[in-house]
């Protein structure tokens, strides 16, 4: 099937979701050669990936991922009750596509601790750096979080502390067949888009940052098809894959299978604009210091952008009714050192 798919995409034809599912199953099953994988993803990039193609690929990656179970089970002799199903507890992810090129610090990773401190279960999906100086896995490792842990430990972190890190290479083993072609090609492809769509914990609430404005509506449509209950897809007009403070942000607001588009500005929430340099990061050690400083209460643009993005996450998780309420809750979580406590708890629970 993959040879026929390559031929069709090269001719500018779109693949149906069912076709993409068949092709991705070949790739994930080790039945496609590196040359075929490389040809397909480059052809898709040149044509432009469609909603159906991305959705089909995401479904297969989800099916092949090692599942992380976030439900806590209560045994009351007569039966077991999944507490998360019964209470409809939200599970949130703050994973973005990366690739913005803005060299900012790890905003969404910092947000994860703030949101967890506000009572949201966070299944933070991430990886090492691909296009930036420091990915989420890099900064967490520099902070003291161990990445080489079993799924049972990740599940326990989420159950007991409300936050766990889902290290993509450990949970997407079938992706090993695409690693070589991706590395050798060296350009953004559909796989850069798929990471945030394939959380192994099945997070149904999400704030997803994207590196291109046209991906806002595309990935909002994909998330709706994949069952996202509430979420936002965001793109800063300065290039950031976050809600930004230096420019307006394009946003897709997802609610129960539908989405609406809007543009917001920092001033809408009483925040001052800043420069990209004010949000800059560095290597893993430097970014770890920045994260600790923010969670310890340091003021400035970095704190402000964390508060703003945390607010969107809290609205997505159903913990805040408005962005303003979310910002107040996030500020309280930081100022009372609850967010810092979540970081320290994750470090402690992941020690060998």
Swiss-Prot record:
UniProt-annotated binding residues for Mg(2+) 2: 241-242
Pfam families: Glycos_trans_3N, Glycos_transf_3
Catalytic reactions of this protein: N-(5-phospho-beta-D-ribosyl)anthranilate + diphosphate = 5-phospho-alpha-D-ribose 1-diphosphate + anthranilate
Protein name listed in UniProt: Anthranilate phosphoribosyltransferase
Binding site for 5-phospho-alpha-D-ribose 1-diphosphate: 96, 99-100, 104, 106-109, 124-132, 136
MF GO annotations: anthranilate phosphoribosyltransferase activity; magnesium ion binding
Taxonomic lineage: Bacteria, Pseudomonadati, Thermodesulfobacteriota, Desulfuromonadia, Desulfuromonadales
Assembly: Homodimer.
Binding site for anthranilate 1: 96, 127
Pathway terms, separated by semicolons: Amino-acid biosynthesis; L-tryptophan biosynthesis; L-tryptophan from chorismate: step 2/5
Organism: Syntrophotalea carbinolica (strain DSM 2380 / NBRC 103641 / GraBd1) (Pelobacter carbinolicus)
Needed co-factor(s): Mg(2+)
């Amino acid at each position: 099937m993959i040879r026929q798919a390559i031929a069709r995409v090269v001719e500018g034809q779109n693949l149906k979701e069912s076709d993409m599912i068949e092709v991705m199953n070949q790739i994930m099953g080790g039945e496609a050669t590196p040359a075929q994988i490389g040809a397909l993803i480059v052809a898709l990039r040149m044509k432009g990936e469609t909603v159906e193609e991305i959705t089909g690929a995401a479904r297969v990656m989800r099916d092949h991922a090692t599942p992380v179970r976030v439900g806590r089970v209560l045994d009351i002799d007569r039966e077991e009750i999944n507490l998360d199903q019964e209470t409809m507890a939200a599970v949130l992810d703050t994973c973005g596509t990366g690739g913005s090129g803005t060299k900012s610090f790890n905003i969404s990773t910092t947000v994860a601790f703030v949101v967890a401190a506000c009572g949201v279960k966070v299944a933070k999906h991430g990886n090492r750096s691909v296009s930036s100086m420091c990915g989420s896995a890099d900064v967490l490792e520099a902070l003291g979080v161990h990445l080489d842990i079993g799924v049972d430990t990740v599940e326990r972190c989420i159950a007991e502390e409300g936050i766990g890190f889902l290290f993509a290479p450990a949970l997407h083993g079938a992706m090993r067949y695409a690693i070589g072609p991706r590395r050798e090609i060296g350009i953004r492809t559909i796989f850069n888009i798929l990471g945030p769509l394939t959380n192994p914990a099945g997070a149904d609430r999400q704030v997803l940052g994207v590196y291109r404005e046209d991906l806002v509506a595309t990935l909002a449509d994909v998330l709706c098809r994949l069952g996202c209950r509430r979420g936002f897809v965001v793109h800063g007009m300065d290039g950031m894959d976050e809600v930004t403070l230096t420019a307006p942000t394009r946003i897709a607001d997802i609610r129960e299978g539908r989405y609406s588009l809007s543009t917001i500005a920092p001033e809408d929430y009483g925040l001052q604009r800043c420069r990209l340099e004010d949000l800059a990061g560095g290597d893993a050690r430097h970014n770890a210091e920045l994260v600790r400083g923010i969670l310890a209460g340091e003021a400035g643009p970095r704190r402000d952008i964390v508060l703003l993005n945390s607010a969107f996450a809290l609205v997505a998780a159903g913990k805040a009714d408005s962005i303003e309420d979310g910002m107040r809750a996030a500020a309280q979580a930081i100022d009372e050192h609850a967010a810092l406590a979540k970081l320290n708890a994750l470090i402690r629970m992941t020690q060998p």
